[in-house]
Amino acid sequence: MTKVGGLGATHQADKTVEDIVNAVKPSIQSKLGTNISNLKVISYKTQLVNGTNYFVKVRTENGYAHLRIYKPFSGAASLVSVQDGKAKDDEITYF
């Protein structure tokens, strides 16, 4: 079990996280400044705060990126930050 505030273990993509990423796709495209029609969720970690931070590794047309998406306990998800230029084997860490 992950303690509050700590990053959890890495999980493979699942429907829940894919839906969260899809909900913020316009923001992702705006931050990356490129077409993300082929965006694919690879893996993710979570952090329990006053809601959940999702740290998500995605494959884009240009390589890989890490996303931080915040989802409150009740309400819509929002994109907080993007790290572009990542590699397939880069570990997901807090940013």
UniProtKB/Swiss-Prot annotation:
Any GO BP annotation: regulation of proteolysis
Keywords noted in UniProt: Cytoplasm, Protease inhibitor, Thiol protease inhibitor
Gene Ontology terms, MF aspect: cysteine-type endopeptidase inhibitor activity
InterPro entries to which the protein is assigned, alphabetical: Cystatin_dom, Cystatin_sf, Prot_inh_stefin
Protein name: Cystatin-A2
Cytoplasm in keyword set: yes
Residues marked Reactive site (site): 5
Compartments where located: Cytoplasm
Motif residue range(s): Secondary area of contact: 47-51
Stated role: Intracellular thiol proteinase inhibitor. Inhibits cathepsin B, but not papain.
GO cellular component: cytosol
Organism whose genome encodes this protein: Dictyostelium discoideum
Predominant location category: cytoplasm
Superkingdom field: Eukaryota
Family label: Belongs to the cystatin family.
